[in-house]
């Protein structure tokens, strides 16, 4: 799996709203602040106790959601949203599914362009920087993203109502609200203080922090926090280098891959459109994930 790609998720969400049934998006808040809030969700665990060298994410809920049980978690969320009959909850299901598709498509690309000197964190950060700089016309390494997306760092009661029961049923975890409160507070702190350094002083300080304190296994290294000042164009694959993606050899540039992801997300949105529009029809869902659910008819 790849590192946090919340910025990329955000832009793809914006470009994918047109694939969602208009009855679901009608009168729903799809502002930049809301989209970035949901763009954070899939990788929220990356921010849990992010600058605490002594505590790690022992719950790993975010990581578990992204694992083999993802289809079962998503199905529970879909069922919850359908029964609650709340368009906001249905829309959240789309964002969760989109995030999954993005990671599935981006993982082979990031692995292909990672090297010993340019690890996955560096590649992911470069990708985020490229799309932010391109779309916003400002430099991400100088931008306080906590201010830029000022109202994006808290899940509301509707959000918790959607994910709480599915997380209990699929993963047996009973503290979803507190877990995601900690994650989103960590995200706010990260984007407010840790992700940029206008003077460059944080880079050596992070190196010292990692060397003396940050030794916990699976704990994110502070040296990966900063966005790069310059875009490494080799990661954009402008030379059309071939790489393997899901057993197929491809040579997409980063921008071409973005368009391919949109095509895949359109398919994913059709799956949810069919489910919510046709009385919980799971045929498309089962076909997409190659699964078979013995669904009991809801009263």
Question: Model regions: which residues?
Answer:
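N-terminal leader/auxiliary helical segments
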Residues: 1-94, 98-299
């Amino acid at each position: 799996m790849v590192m946090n790609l919340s910025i990329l998720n955000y832009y793809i969400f914006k470009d994918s709203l047109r694939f969602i049934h208009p009855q679901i998006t009608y009168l729903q808040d799809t502002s930049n602040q809301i989209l970035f809030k949901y763009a954070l969700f899939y990788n929220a665990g990356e921010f849990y106790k992010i600058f605490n060298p002594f505590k790690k994410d022992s719950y790993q809920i975010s990581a578990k959601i992204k694992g083999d049980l993802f289809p079962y978690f998503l199905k529970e969320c879909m069922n919850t949203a359908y029964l609650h009959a709340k368009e906001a909850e249905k829309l959240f299901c789309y964002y969760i599914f989109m995030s999954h598709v993005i990671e599935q498509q981006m993982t082979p690309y990031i692995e292909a362009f990672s090297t010993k000197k340019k690890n996955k964190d560096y590649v992911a950060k470069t990708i985020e920087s490229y799309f932010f700089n391109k779309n916003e016309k400002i430099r991400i390494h100088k931008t306080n993203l906590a201010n830029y997306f000022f109202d994006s760092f808290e899940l509301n009661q509707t959000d918790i109502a959607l994910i709480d029961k599915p997380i209990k049923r699929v993963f047996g975890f009973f503290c979803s609200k507190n877990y995601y409160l900690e994650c989103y507070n960590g995200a706010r702190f990260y984007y407010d203080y840790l992700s940029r350094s206008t003077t460059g002083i944080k880079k050596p300080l992070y190196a010292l922090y990692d060397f003396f304190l940050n030794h916990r296994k699976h704990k994110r290294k502070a040296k990966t926090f900063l966005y790069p000042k310059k875009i490494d164009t080799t990661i954009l694959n402008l030379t059309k280098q071939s790489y393997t993606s899901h057993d197929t050899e491809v040579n997409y540039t980063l921008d071409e891959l973005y368009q391919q992801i949109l095509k895949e997300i359109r398919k994913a949105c059709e799956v949810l459109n069919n489910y919510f529009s046709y009385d919980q029809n799971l045929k498309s869902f089962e076909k997409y994930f190659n699964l078979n659910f013995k669904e009991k008819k809801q009263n």
